Amino acid sequence: MSDIIVRVIDAYVFTRKNNQIRFLTLKRAKTKMYEHLWQGVAGKIEEGETSWEAAIRELEEETGFVPLRMFVADHVSRFYEAHGDRINLIPVFGIEVDNENVVLSDEHCEFQWVDFDTAHDTLVWNGQKEGIAAVFNMLNSNDDRIKWSEISF
C-alpha cells in the first residue's frame, strides 16, 4: 500500500505593480533535478518545521525576499512518486513581496515577473498550474478566503 506524505511545499510569489498582479517564476539551473523547469518557490520541509515555515525559509533562500503577506491557498497539489511508492500532498501558499529585486540562489538560473496568463502558461505540471490558479483566484475574489487563511509570522 502506498504511503501518503507531506514533505514539500509550493509557493507562488506575487507583487502588485500599477494595480496589476505580477507573479515570479524561477527557472531551475542546469545542474539541478528538473533542469530548466519553470516553477514558483518550492522545496522540502525540514525536520521540526511547519509547511508555512518551510515556505518562508525557501522564499528567503531562493529569492532573498521576506514575505510582506502570506496565505494558504485553497488547493493542495499532489503527485505519485514511483520511487518510494508514495503519494505526495503539497501545501500551496500565496506570498506577497514589496519589490521585484530577486537575489537568485544557485538552484535557479533565471527569473521573470509576469502576468498570471504568462506564468500559468510557463509552468509545466498540472499541480503547478492549479496551484497558481488557486492563488490568483483568491486574489481576485470578493470573499474572505485570504483573510481566513492568512498566516501571521
Where are the predicted features?
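Residue-level preference for beta-strand/loop junctions
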Residues: 5, 34, 87-89
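NUDIX/MutT-family hydrolases
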Residues: 92, 103-135
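Short aromatic/basic micro-patch
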Residues: 39, 87, 113
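Charged phosphate-binding loop/patch that engages nucleotide di/tri-phosphates or the phosphate backbone
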Residues: 127-153
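Conserved N-terminal beta-strand and adjoining loop/helix that marks the start
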Residues: 1-23
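Active-site segment of metal-dependent pyrophosphate-handling enzymes
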Residues: 60, 64-100
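Short, well-ordered beta-strand micro-motif
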Residues: 13-15, 27, 92-96, 115
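Conserved Nudix-box catalytic region and its N-terminal flanking loop in Nudix hydrolases
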Residues: 20-61
